[in-house]
Amino acid sequence: MVGDGCSRILLLTADIGEGHNTAARAIAERVDQLWPGTEVRTLDIITMMAPGMSRLTRSTYRLTLDHAPVIYQCFYDALWRHRWFARLSKRVVAAWCGWRLWPRLRRFQPEVVVSTHPFGAAAMDQLRRVHRLALPTATFVTDFAPHPFWVFSEIDAHFVMHEVSAPDTRRLSARGMVCVAAPPISRMFRPRDQGEARDSLGLRASAFVVLVTGGAWGVGSLEPAIAALLNLGDRVQVIAVCGRNQDLLQRLEALGAPRSRLVPLGFVDIMPELMASADVVVTNAGGVTSLEAFASARPVLLVDPIAGHGKANAAMMEQAGLAVVCPGIRELRSTVAELVADQGRLAKMRAAELAHLQGRDLCDDLALLATAEPLPLPPGGGMRQAIRTLTAA
């Protein structure tokens, strides 16, 4: 132990988009602040499953979202509608991930394990059952709308992003703590002076700046959205963050629009400054990008949300009063036009975001986990489980 904290913490994440890694980095940053000297190790749970698995998962997921979103939506819906399907899917993933994680866990001997990806939670659930692990485990549910793959009964704490997220988490068999937490994002995302941010980026001081982003992959209906925004007139200046989607970046650059109207960017490390400069943020998934916008007190418009968890996140964010869902491009255009003309509505949206985050601190959430008692171990699994435990020792 380091003071009242931990000497070794294991973070389980996955390189699927950038949100899960962003959350893990933010947690590591706060651990260093809370308990200097703590050894933090981060593992990519999907890379660990098998050689090439991370690349295969990324490409399959992205192709499905781009070209066959109905397939992903059907899978997501089946997790909710058919308990047997959710249970079977979770147990297969948990067994595979747990088997691959176990030797690494034994070598590192962490005192706390925190997951920012569902597969990390699955692995720890399996190891609690099979190897009778009695160490604190937690999951930061970075989706606003929890889904069955996020929630496992042997996890001590599920940290969710809003009060509206808690009931579904409890309903999905979470028997440990369900806590509303501060978003696991960098401290750089905070309310900042908009004028200074625009000066530093060379943006127009008098413009209505719309930040459009499709996350690290630049997925979704970004081009139609950008075209609709540019048609609103000279008052609107669009910053388009294309992530690693180089084809999209090149197409936007080929438009030849003046910088006073359109600023196309690739993968950037200045997102805090871009958020601070914007009047509104337009995105399509409702993941960590939206959490960063909330922390920056920038209203979020969710346009044509991506299938599955994207649509669920959008609905729950709107229910919480923190975002406006625009089902299509026409609704996006009319909503932005209304906000350009109604600064009072913008101010109310910012106030709602600030009120939601008031008094929340990620350090407090981690300190709670470090002092929590692990859940009672599940009942023994019989001779087969005992043999597996003995042979693995």
Segments (PLM) and residue ranges:
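A short alpha->beta transition loop at the rim of the catalytic pocket in nucleotide-sugar-dependent
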Residues: A278-D279, A297-P299
